[in-house]
């Protein structure tokens, strides 16, 4: 095996000579056609060839440095020595030696360096040698389970510029996911940084409070403990959800108690169990991070206990206990003592959107009922002010985690009916209600109608020059009321809503009572350059025929009219 190892001083004073030794093995310079070269790489610059010596003692130098260089070999020691005189700071570099071999092709000799040493760093400075001073670098951002946590170390005021960083967990397990950055000369001394990227889940779930940074330097090795980011410590909120009265099934009749611990951090939960003597029938899910847009990461966990109806009605007390960070949190539940929870039935009457009316040619009325303890006795009905009852379809949801149900009652009226001038009432009855609950909706009156202005903006030339994508913008302004529908088409065919983004209507700053919105369609630059047409269809109740459109393509570069009557649904919704 061929190896080459460079050695020499790490720090040299200006105007002094520099002597570097290359010790090699695996070949001999007394063998024909064997050669050794010296090369250097100054900081931030390309490699620079310096000198070469051959097996027959012939030597060659760089033209710019030949007056300052000498090269010699010692066959008995397998060494090549390079001497550079009158050094100065520009000679600061990493110096390499490499074996040079040659081959003959088509009558020509080709020389190449096939094996290199690892290099030795030489700093030319009038300053005194000094070991680095270390400073920890800690991330200030909140940790996210799907991201990484960055910590680092700043090494400062060291000379010469020869430093090696390594990271370890608890002084034992080596960390490989590191990044090094080039040294920087500042005030005659050097500074360098090293960074390590750790998975957030390891930081939040592990027991390590710091990582160890080892720094090797010719003037002394040093160690620094870098603390890991502090994770917010939050206690769990423990809730128990009891089964509904009709929630027991089978033989013997059984149901489930659900215990949920939420909002805690860090992740570790030492135990989650119901009662003291429960040995079976318990299923505990894995701890999961809660979905949050901001703030510290918190966690939740759910445990389910299967219980018999006889035990539940026999006044047994069930206790869910959670141990977290040395503290105990618990919640009791029994058929005689139900945990406090808001179980009042609520009713929401949801008016139809203009988009649904425009697309289906019918007006759908929706009545949502929540927090039902049972579903078999619920009834939902819609009535109109003038013509009485409207046929209503009712759908029941599956049981929610808090052991309640929800139901939806839907009714449709024909679009031609006078929705704007009539009141519609949703009526809900249930055995838990002393009297029916009612919610009434009608279209707001007195709203001025203003039809929208539609502008279609082609892709910007600067974006097309990048040859990546093309963004077409549809700007809709000055309309009232705020309910508007926007759809994109390509060559007369509707595009999937996943392919574009439409903003919510927003008030016009200079026109009170009016609104604006925009929709953005992004296609590939290749598609745009084929000349395909793209159409923005805008529907609003103030428009003639309720719809208008603008079309653009590469050849026109400006919007034109386009017949998009097919965008409207061919099948009207069913009216009752």
From Swiss-Prot:
Pfam families given in the database record: C1-set (PF07654), V-set (PF07686)
CDD domains, per database record: IgC1_CH1_IgM (cd21819), IgC1_CH2_Mu (cd16093), IgC1_CH3_IgAEM_CH2_IgG (cd07696), IgC1_CH3_IgAGD_CH4_IgAEM (cd05768)
S-S pairs: 22-97, 153-212, 259-320, 367-426, 474-536
Positions of region (Variable (V) domain, involved in antigen recognition): 1-124
Role noted for this protein: Immunoglobulins, also known as antibodies, are membrane-bound or secreted glycoproteins produced by B lymphocytes. In the recognition phase of humoral immunity, the membrane-bound immunoglobulins serve as receptors which, upon binding of a specific antigen, trigger the clonal expansion and differentiation of B lymphocytes into immunoglobulins-secreting plasma cells. Secreted immunoglobulins mediate the effector phase of humoral immunity, which results in the elimination of bound antigens.
Compartment(s): Secreted; Cell membrane
Assembly mode: Immunoglobulins are composed of two identical heavy chains and two identical light chains; disulfide-linked. It is found almost exclusively as a homopentamer in the serum. Membrane-bound IgM molecules are non-covalently associated with heterodimer of CD79A and CD79B.
Domain Ig-like: 1-97, 132-212, 236-334, 352-442, 452-553
Official protein name in the record: Immunoglobulin mu heavy chain
Post-translational modification Pyrrolidone carboxylic acid, affected residues: 1
Superkingdom in the source lineage: Eukaryota
GO cellular component: extracellular region; immunoglobulin complex; plasma membrane
Keywords for this protein: Adaptive immunity, Cell membrane, Disulfide bond, Glycoprotein, Immunity, Immunoglobulin, Immunoglobulin domain, Membrane, Pyrrolidone carboxylic acid, Repeat, Secreted
Glycosylation (residues): 74, 170, 332, 395, 402, 563
Region Constant (C) domain: start-end pairs: 125-576
A biological-process GO annotation: adaptive immune response
């Amino acid at each position: 095996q061929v190896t080459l190892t460079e050695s020499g001083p790490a720090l040299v004073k200006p105007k002094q000579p520099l002597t570097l030794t290359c010790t090699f093995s695996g070949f001999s310079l007394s063998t024909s056609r064997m050669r050794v070269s010296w090369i250097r790489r100054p900081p931030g610059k390309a490699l620079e060839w310096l000198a070469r010596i051959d097996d027959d003692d012939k030597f060659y130098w760089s033209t710019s440095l030949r007056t300052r260089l000498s090269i010699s070999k010692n066959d008995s020691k397998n060494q090549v020595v390079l001497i550079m005189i009158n050094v100065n700071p520009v000679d600061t570099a990493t110096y390499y030696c490499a074996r040079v071999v040659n081959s003959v092709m088509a009558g020509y000799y080709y020389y190449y360096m096939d094996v290199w040493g690892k290099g030795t760093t030489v700093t030319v400075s009038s300053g005194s040698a000094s070991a680095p001073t270390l400073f920890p670098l800690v991330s200030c951002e909140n940790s996210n389970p799907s991201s990484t946590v960055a910590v680092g170390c700043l090494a400062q005021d060291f000379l010469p510029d020869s430093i090696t960083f390594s990271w370890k967990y608890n002084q034992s397990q080596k960390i490989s996911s590191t990044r090094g950055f080039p040294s920087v000369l500042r005030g005659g001394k050097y500074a360098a940084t090293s960074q390590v990227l750790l998975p957030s889940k390891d930081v939040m779930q592990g027991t390590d409070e710091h990582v160890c940074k080892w720094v090797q330097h010719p003037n002394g090795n040093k160690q620094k403990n870098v603390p890991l980011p502090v994770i917010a410590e939050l206690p769990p909120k423990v809730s128990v959800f009891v089964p509904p009265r009709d929630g027991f099934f089978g033989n013997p009749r059984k149901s489930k108690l659900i215990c949920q611990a939420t909002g805690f951090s860090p992740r570790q939960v030492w135990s989650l169990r119901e009662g003291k003597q429960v040995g079976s029938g318990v299923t505990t899910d894995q701890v999961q991070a809660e979905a949050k847009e901001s703030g510290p990461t918190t966690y939740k966990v759910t445990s389910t206990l299967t219980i018999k109806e006889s035990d539940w009605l026999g006044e047994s007390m069930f206790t869910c206990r959670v141990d977290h960070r040395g503290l105990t949190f618990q919640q009791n539940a029994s058929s005689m003592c139900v945990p406090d929870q808001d179980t009042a039935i609520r009713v929401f009457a949801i008016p139809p959107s203009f988009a649904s009316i425009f697309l289906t040619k019918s007006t759908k009325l929706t009545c949502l009922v929540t927090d039902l303890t049972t579903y078999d006795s619920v009834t939902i009905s819609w009535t109109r002010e003038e013509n009485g009852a409207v046929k209503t379809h009712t759908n029941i949801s599956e049981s929610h985690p808090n052991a309640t149900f929800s139901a939806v009652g839907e009714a449709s009226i024909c679009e031609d009916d006078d929705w704007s001038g009539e009141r519609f009432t949703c009526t809900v009855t249930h055995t838990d209600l002393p009297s029916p609950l009612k919610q009434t909706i009608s279209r707001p009156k007195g709203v001025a109608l203003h039809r929208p202005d539609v502008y279609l903006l082609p892709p910007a030339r600067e974006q097309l020059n990048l040859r990546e994508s093309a963004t077409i913008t549809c700007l809709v302004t000055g309309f009232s009321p705020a309910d508007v529908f926007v759809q994109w088409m390509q060559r007369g065919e509707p595009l999937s809503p996943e392919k574009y983004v439409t903003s919510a209507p927003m008030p016009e700053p200079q026109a009170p009572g009016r609104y604006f919105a925009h929709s953005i369609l992004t296609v590939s630059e290749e598609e745009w350059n084929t000349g395909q047409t793209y159409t923005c269809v805008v529907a609003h109740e103030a428009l003639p025929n309720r719809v208008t459109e603008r079309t653009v393509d590469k050849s026109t570069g400006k919007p034109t009219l386009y017949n998009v009557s097919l965008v409207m649904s061919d099948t009207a919704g069913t009216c009752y």
